[in-house]
């Protein structure tokens, strides 16, 4: 097996050198210290010879034309089609992950094939009548360099760009990527540090800071919470989230509450009852939030 460098994998941005050919990744709040020959937590940023390289750059594993509402975005280019792109890897470890076949695993550079250039993806989106390109399926933060080049190419072609993200990103990376994004749907996993720590292996505050940064850059944003019965379904937690939105964003922001179905490593909660989602929606509307959407109801 050749090294990532020998196979031409792209040098990653957001890195700094450490003694002994170690590197520190500055892409997400984990700021992984990565020894030579190893990958970071996400599995796709690998240290080869003291240089961090992105295995995900140029290697989409999911390409699909979707209705924009599937992201979900309900108030951005309604009725249009978006060209969805996903790679692999994630910087959170959600036990209830609904897309674990792409987000979690070990990735062999020998299995990745030839690099797919941003220009080819954008041209394919145009050929298929898409109005936007969406970075989705797995966490786009882990392929930020690829997403950034695709986004710039998309804008030159007159397309909009969409990000579907957990928001677990450093401020410096967000300040680089977010200006090139026209619309985003961000996950709000559960409005407590305990929820993020115990069920996602992350933390809440960096996510909230990412939301603030995106808002400052003026893109359209919608937010989605996957409701796990017994974990993040209380009206108290919902109110804490709504209070933050009202204070730091705007009551008019579209908020999505979606149904959980047991998946990956978490089966402690039953599927979300539709009645529970309706209760949350009615509560939010009574509080003066007009744009409340429900999803993933089977």
Give a label for each model feature.
Residues 1-36, 230-298:
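Auxiliary Fe-S-binding modules of radical SAM enzymes
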Residues 1-87, 100-104:
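N-terminal [4Fe-4S]-dependent radical SAM core
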Residues 38, 90, 192:
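A generic "binding-loop/recognition-motif" signal
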Residues 77-84, 91, 121-125, 132:
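Iron-sulfur-cluster electron-transfer modules
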Residues 87-89, 137:
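Glycine-rich His-Gly loop
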Residues 94-98:
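The canonical Cys-X-X-Cys-His
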Residues 102-114, 156:
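A short alpha->loop->secondary-structure connector
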Residues 115-272:
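Conserved AdoMet/S-adenosylmethionine-binding subsite of the radical SAM
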């Amino acid at each position: 097996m050749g090294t990532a460098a020998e196979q031409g994998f792209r040098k990653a941005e957001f890195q700094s050198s450490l003694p002994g050919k170690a590197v520190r990744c500055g892409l997400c709040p984990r700021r992984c210290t990565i020894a030579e020959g190893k990958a970071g937590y996400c599995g796709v940023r690998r240290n080869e010879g003291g240089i961090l390289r992105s295995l995900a750059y140029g290697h989409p594993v999911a390409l699909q034309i979707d209705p924009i509402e599937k992201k979900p975005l309900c108030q951005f280019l309604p009725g249009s089609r978006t060209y969805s792109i996903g790679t692999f890897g994630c910087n959170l470890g959600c036990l209830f992950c609904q897309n674990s076949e792409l987000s979690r695993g070990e990735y062999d550079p020998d299995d990745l094939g030839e690099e797919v250039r941003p220009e080819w993806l954008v041209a394919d989106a145009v050929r298929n009548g898409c109005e936007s390109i969406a970075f989705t399926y797995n966490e786009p933060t882990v392929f930020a360099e690829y997403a950034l080049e695709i986004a710039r190419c998309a804008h030159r072609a007159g397309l909009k760009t969409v990000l579907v993200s957990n928001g677990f990103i450093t401020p410096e990376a967000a300040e680089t990527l977010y200006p090139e994004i026209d619309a985003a749907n961000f996950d709000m996993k559960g409005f407590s540090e305990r929820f993020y720590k115990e069920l996602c292996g992350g933390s809440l505050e960096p996510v909230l800071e990412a939301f603030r940064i995106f808002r400052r850059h003026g893109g359209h944003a919608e937010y989605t919470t996957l409701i796990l019965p017994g974990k993040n379904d209380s009206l108290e937690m919902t109110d804490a989230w709504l209070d933050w939105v009202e204070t730091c964003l705007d009551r008019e922001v579209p908020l999505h509450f979606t149904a959980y179905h047991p998946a990956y490593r978490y089966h402690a909660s039953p599927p979300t009852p539709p009645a529970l989602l309706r209760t949350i929606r009615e509560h939010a509307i009574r509080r003066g939030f007009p744009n409340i959407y429900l999803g993933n109801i089977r």
